[in-house]
């Protein structure tokens, strides 16, 4: 192994070790091996942002109604009406803006820092939400990443099941598209 490969392996090991204690399995689940350890919602309509949040949170916690109410609350907080601006946050077919996703997460007790994608405090990270401007469908798409049961998982609502990936694949994918850390509620 050359010096560059040794450094790369060392960095990957450090990254893997750092996330092992950060991301926890969903409450009550104790699994091992490559068994799929949690909930994954497949896409219906263009609700990929909502599905990605539910995949990170581990259940059907966010509904289309929640998304609409969160978007309206966001507009109200920003001093806007709910006309055309609402369609910018929640399209009729279910495509959601990052502002709407952040607002619904706040309503559920989580946070998403819009100014610092994926660079926020990892010790409270529940998972990662990633925006992919061009997907296989030719439109915008949201996917999720979680660390669970000793493995890193890519949760894409267009896919039939979660896909286990390596720390190297995660690091590469996080650098390719805008990615946000979903933060757990702070306790204290």
Predicted stretch roles:
Residues 2-91:
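Active-site nucleophile-adjacent alpha helix/oxyanion-hole segment immediately C-terminal to the catalytic cysteine
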Residues 45, 55, 134-135, 149-150, ...:
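Conserved beta-strand elements of beta-rich interaction domains across eukaryotes
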Residues 46, 50-54, 99, 103, ...:
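Amphipathic alpha-helical interface elements that mediate macromolecular binding in regulatory proteins
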Residues 56, 60-61, 109-113, 136, ...:
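Eukaryotic basic, amphipathic alpha-helical target segments in cytosolic regions
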Residues 78-135, 146-148:
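Conserved active-site-adjacent core of cysteine acyl-enzyme catalytic domains
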Residues 130, 152-155:
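Short hydrophobic/aromatic-rich beta-strand segments that constitute the beta-sheet cores
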Residues 137-142:
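Short, surface-exposed coil-to-beta transition loops
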Residues 154-188:
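Noncatalytic regulatory segments and standalone regulatory/sensor domains
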């Amino acid at each position: 192994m050359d010096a560059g490969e040794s450094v790369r392996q060392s960095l990957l090991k450090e990254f893997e070790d750092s996330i092992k204690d950060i991301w926890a399995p969903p409450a009550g689940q104790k699994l091992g091996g490559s068994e799929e350890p949690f909930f994954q919602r497949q896409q219906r309509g263009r609700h990929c942002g909502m599905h990605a949040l539910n995949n990170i949170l581990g259940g059907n916690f966010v509904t289309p109604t929640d998304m609409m109410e969160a978007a309206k609350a966001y507009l109200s907080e920003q001093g806007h009406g709910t006309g055309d601006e609402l369609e910018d946050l929640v399209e009729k077919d279910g495509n959601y803006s990052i502002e709407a996703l952040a607002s619904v997460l706040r309503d559920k007790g989580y946070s998403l820092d819009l100014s610092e994608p994926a660079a926020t405090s990892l010790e409270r990270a529940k998972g990662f939400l990633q925006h992919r401007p061009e997907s296989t469908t030719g439109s915008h798409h949201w996917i999720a990443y979680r660390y669970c049961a000793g493995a890193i998982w890519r949760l894409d609502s267009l896919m039939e099941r979660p896909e286990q990936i390596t720390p190297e694949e995660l690091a590469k994918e996080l650098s390719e598209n805008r990615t946000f850390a979903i933060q757990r509620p702070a306790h204290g």
